[in-house]
Amino acid sequence: KDVSARYGEDTISGVAGWSDAIVWIPYEMYQVTGDRLVLKENYEAMEKWCEYIIHTAEKHSTLAIPEQYDRYLWNTGFHFGEWLGPGRGDHTGEPFGICRETAYYTTPFFGYATIKKMTEICQVLGKKDKAKDYGTIAAKMKTSIQEGMMRRNLMPDDLMGAYVLAFAFGLVPKDLYNAYKKKLLSLLEKSGRCIGTGFLATPFILDVLC
C-alpha cells in the first residue's frame, strides 16, 4: 500500500535489503508453492520498487567511479547497510558511519539481485518484453559492479560481507574468483573463524563457504 500521500514523500525512503522484500518474499513464496497468484497480486508493487531502484541508480554519486558505470549502480541516499556486523566497528567517527561504509557494497549488490529476480518473475508471468528490459538493466548493473568497483580495487579490504554477497549473487568475475576466495578465507582466519558479516550477508555465508 502506498502511504506516501499520508506521511509525505520526504519521510519515505526505500533502503536496500529491507525494501527489496517486496520482490524477494513473493518470489520465494512462488518458488516454494509453485503458485503464481502471489506474483500476480504483488506485481504492481514489485514493479514500482524496481523502477525506483533503476531511477535512483541513475543519480550521480560522489564516488570515484566512471559515469558509464556509476549510472547503473544504486549507490545514493541513506541505507542501513550491515550495521549489525560484528567483524569490526565504525572507522569514520560519524553517526551511522558503519551504515555508510557497508552500504557502499550492499546497496548496488542488492539492487542488482532484485532486478535480476524481477527478470525471472516476468519470465514466469509471461511478460516477455518486461523480462527483456529488466534483464538488460540487470546485465548492465552486473557489468558496472565488476568494472566500476571490483576491477578498480574499490572493494572494502576488511569487511567480510562484501565478499560473501559478491559470491552469493554471482558477481565475481572468473579472473578474480581465486583472489576473492583467498580474501574471504583470510578474513575468516583473521577473525578466529568467527562470522563477521552483518544481517544482510549472514543468511548467505554458509552456502558461500560450502
Question: For the regions a protein language model found, what residue spans apply to each?
Answer:
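Active-site core of glycosidic bond-cleaving carbohydrate-active enzymes
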Residues: 1-210
